[in-house]
């Protein structure tokens, strides 16, 4: 039995293409892997605080007493990291906003990236500590950006996930959804076909 963590990060709720596709993924996965446990965390409806000068002090080893706000941030960081490490498959629904990921998803990453916990520095360079996972990124875009200079989502997510130790990453693209109903429908159809292929593996 595997444990699957689904991270939603769109601000558009039910109108979101990435949310719709991640819901489709969950439906298909449950149909094919009924014994697996699935956890869904919506980073828009349950937002993560923005990392600032006060909160970053909570995430670094220190003997200094923590403020109540720092204590809350550290507890949340511990919770998010424990959840991440407890799951085998990580599904990230990542819409493109202004060429990059949403603020909601970036805030999540800022709280799970902790030296000595999810990565460490060695004589040979950084080493990820969140290993043995598979990641599936479902990314939606209004335009066409894949393999082009305007796609900052794909390299960023590949780099971040690899940095913390998740190197088995597959991407599902839904592009051109702002180019009209026909193009949007094709984007959804192509993305669902890619999801079907991944689920069937």
Swiss-Prot record:
Disulfide bonds: none annotated. FMN binds at residues 10, 16-18, 96-99, 140-143. It catalyses: 2 a quinone + NADH + H(+) = 2 a 1,4-benzosemiquinone + NAD(+); N,N-dimethyl-1,4-phenylenediamine + anthranilate + 2 NAD(+) = 2-(4-dimethylaminophenyl)diazenylbenzoate + 2 NADH + 2 H(+). It holds the Pfam family Flavodoxin_2. Binds 1 FMN per subunit. Homodimer. Quinone reductase that provides resistance to thiol-specific stress caused by electrophilic quinones. Also exhibits azoreductase activity. Catalyzes the reductive cleavage of the azo bond in aromatic azo compounds to the corresponding amines. Belongs to the azoreductase type 1 family. This is FMN-dependent NADH:quinone oxidoreductase. The lineage of its organism: Bacteria, Pseudomonadati, Pseudomonadota, Gammaproteobacteria, Enterobacterales.
